[in-house]
UniProtKB/Swiss-Prot annotation:
The gene is dnaN. This is Beta sliding clamp. Transmembrane segments: none annotated. Confers DNA tethering and processivity to DNA polymerases and other proteins. Acts as a clamp, forming a ring around DNA (a reaction catalyzed by the clamp-loading complex) which diffuses in an ATP-independent manner freely and bidirectionally along dsDNA. Initially characterized for its ability to contact the catalytic subunit of DNA polymerase III (Pol III), a complex, multichain enzyme responsible for most of the replicative synthesis in bacteria; Pol III exhibits 3'-5' exonuclease proofreading activity. It comes from Buchnera aphidicola subsp. Baizongia pistaciae (strain Bp). It is found in: Cytoplasm. Disulfide bonds: none annotated. Belongs to the beta sliding clamp family. Forms a ring-shaped head-to-tail homodimer around DNA which binds and tethers DNA polymerases and other proteins to the DNA. The DNA replisome complex has a single clamp-loading complex (3 tau and 1 each of delta, delta', psi and chi subunits) which binds 3 Pol III cores (1 core on the leading strand and 2 on the lagging strand) each with a beta sliding clamp dimer. Additional proteins in the replisome are other copies of gamma, psi and chi, Ssb, DNA helicase and RNA primase. Signal peptide: none annotated. One of its GO terms (cellular component) is DNA polymerase III complex.
């Protein structure tokens, strides 16, 4: 294997594949990246068994094809400490990977490719396309509601389903739920698989996605979730458990509601929450005519209260909520005004953008600490 490449192109790709690499004393091969040189391209692959990132580099001068695995962290550190505009000469020779840059030379240990894991997606796939913009929107609107290491494993990820010509993303930790949908175009009429993408896969995907109109392909099988970009493929195992029904929790016909300024509500909550109980982060909200009272207290007999104006209301709300949950939602809503409505059956509170039809279509539900 022998090729030449401009350092800045190699660094850009090495950074992405290194996201999956951590210290691994049991399987040292997982600290390596798979490097394949063929057909005038270089392919870099990293994996942690549960996820895989594969990047194809076209800006390369291939002199001799070949493949090997090499430490991902070491090759990245070397390249980052060399000038970005240097042309690198890379060659596999005598079981070492040789990197030459002007008068500098480095020899890295390698491992054979036969032991490098390969995530094989099954043939039974559902495929559809979506823009990077739309996919990143639904992820950023929902990911913060995923559970963290819950015993109910189906909560430790993001639920995806294709329904009524839309992609739905749903996350819940049992105390709150986030739902966002985006329209899909040119869909077949076949039934699409619903899957749960694990938390780590969701967070990694958010890093990889850009706010771009570039169309990407989503492939869903019985065991994997895969995204294909122009020169990058991200694959993740899925959680093979049933996600709970969430549709019955949503208020579809909202006649009674409260409209608040998003920024004013968020800033007041942030200040009041400073003196809330550190474990429960509880704040009380209560409206009186066109004013909303936000109060809290803690075990040290400290108290805080603020009053903000209500833009419009025809309901009475009096409940205690987790301030951090509400602030997460307010940070995600891309509208100057929010709409609060109360579900009298579940005693939950539903939050969404007031201008729902033009803002990203996301709905949030929070269970009260006590009503």
């Amino acid at each position: 294997m022998k090729f030449e490449i401009l350092n800045k192109f190699l660094i850009k790709s090495l950074k992405k594949v290194n996201n999956l690499i951590t210290r691994n004393h049991i399987f040292p091969i997982l600290e390596n990246i798979l490097l394949i040189a063929k057909d005038n391209t270089i392919t870099l692959t990293s994996t942690n068994i549960d996820m895989e990132i594969k990047i194809i580099i076209l800006d390369v001068t291939l002199l001799e094809p070949g493949s090997i695995t090499v430490s991902g962290k070491k090759i990245l550190n070397i390249c980052q400490n060399l000038p970005k505009d240097h042309n690198l000469k890379i060659q596999y020779i005598n079981n070492k990977l040789k990197i030459v840059s002007h008068n500098n030379q480095y020899l890295l240990a390698t491992l054979p490719i036969k032991n490098f894991p390969n995530l094989k997606i099954s043939e039974n796939q559902n495929n559809f396309v979506i823009s990077q913009n739309d996919l990143k929107d639904v992820l950023c609107a929902t990911y913060f509601s995923m559970a963290i290491q819950d015993l109910r494993n189906f909560l430790n990820g993001l639920f995806f389903e294709v329904r009524n010509q839309h992609l739905y993303a749903v996350a819940t930790d049992g105390y709150r739920i986030a739902i966002c949908k985006k329209p899909l175009h040119n869909l077949d009429k076949k039934k699409y698989n619903s899957i749960i993408l694990p938390r780590k896969g969701v967070l990694e995907l958010i890093k990889l996605l850009n706010y771009s109109n570039e169309v990407i392909s989503i492939n869903i099988s019985n065991n994997y979730f895969q995204i294909e970009f122009k020169n990058l493929i991200f694959t993740s195992k899925i959680i093979t458990e049933k996600f709970p029904d969430y549709t019955s929790l949503i208020l579809t016909h909202i006649s009674k509601k409260m409209i608040l300024n998003t920024t004013l509500f968020k800033e007041a909550l942030s200040r009041v929450a400073i003196l809330s109980n550190e474990n429960f982060r509880g704040v009380n909200i209560k409206n009186d005519q066109n004013k909303l009272l936000i109060t809290t207290s803690n075990q040290h007999d400290e108290e805080a209260s603020e009053i903000i104006d209500i833009i419009y209301t025809n309901i009475k709300i009096k409940m205690s909520i987790n301030a951090s949950y509400m602030i997460d939602i307010l940070n995600a809503i891309q509208d100057q005004e929010i709409c609060l409505s109360k579900n009298d059956v579940t005693h939950s509170i539903q939050i969404q953008a007031h201008h729902y039809k033009i803002a990203p279509k996301a709905i949030y539900i929070i269970m009260p600490l006590y009503a």
